[in-house]
């Protein structure tokens, strides 16, 4: 496998995302973490902030690049000359949604393959939305996100509570 693309919003990146990035980077020559620009969705972090945070937590992985994209993933794939999409799966509902997306992407470009990677069981409950919710109510996010970005989240949420 040469170049693979791992797309998502990553608002913010979680330890589950990072686990998929680490594992996927071992099975391809280059992994592009593709951060989706969705002007209709107001995220906690801007696209530039998300890209910077992901770069910060993946800097040890020399074959990982972080870029943003808008529009169809298939167009981004063509631009990057990649034929492989990496998707992490936590639950059966993730599979149902991602399976439909994989079929659509393959319909748009039959040369595109989607590789599903099972999330490590210890992260199967984890989502960016749940991280934001826990942080907004003052809960501890230390086990949910990479340590390097905890200050970014606290600053955005404007919450000073420390983990016990």
UniProtKB/Swiss-Prot annotation:
| Residues annotated as site: Transition state stabilizer | 17
A single GO BP: coenzyme A biosynthetic process
Name the residues that bind substrate.
Answer: 9, 41, 73, 87
Q: Please tell me one Gene Ontology term that the record gives under cellular component.
A: cytoplasm
* Annotated signal peptide: none
Give the E.C. number(s): 2.7.7.3
Q: What is this protein called?
A: Phosphopantetheine adenylyltransferase
Gene this chain is encoded by: coaD
């Amino acid at each position: 496998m040469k170049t693979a693309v791992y797309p998502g919003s990553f608002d913010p990146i979680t330890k589950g995302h990072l686990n998929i990035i680490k594992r996927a980077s071992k099975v391809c020559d280059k992994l592009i973490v593709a951060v989706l620009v969705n002007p209709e969705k107001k995220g906690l972090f801007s696209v530039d902030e998300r890209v910077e945070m992901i770069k910060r937590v993946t800097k040890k992985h020399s074959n990982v690049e972080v870029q943003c994209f808008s529009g169809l993933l298939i167009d981004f794939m063509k631009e990057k000359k990649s034929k492989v999409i990496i998707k992490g799966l936590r639950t059966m509902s993730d599979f149902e949604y991602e399976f439909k997306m994989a079929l659509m992407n393959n319909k748009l470009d039959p040369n595109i393959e989607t590789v599903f990677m099972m999330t490590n069981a210890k992260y199967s409950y984890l989502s960016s939305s749940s991280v934001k919710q826990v942080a907004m109510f003052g809960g501890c996010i230390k086990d949910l996100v990479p340590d390097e970005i905890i200050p970014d989240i606290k600053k955005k949420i404007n919450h000073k509570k420390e983990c016990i």
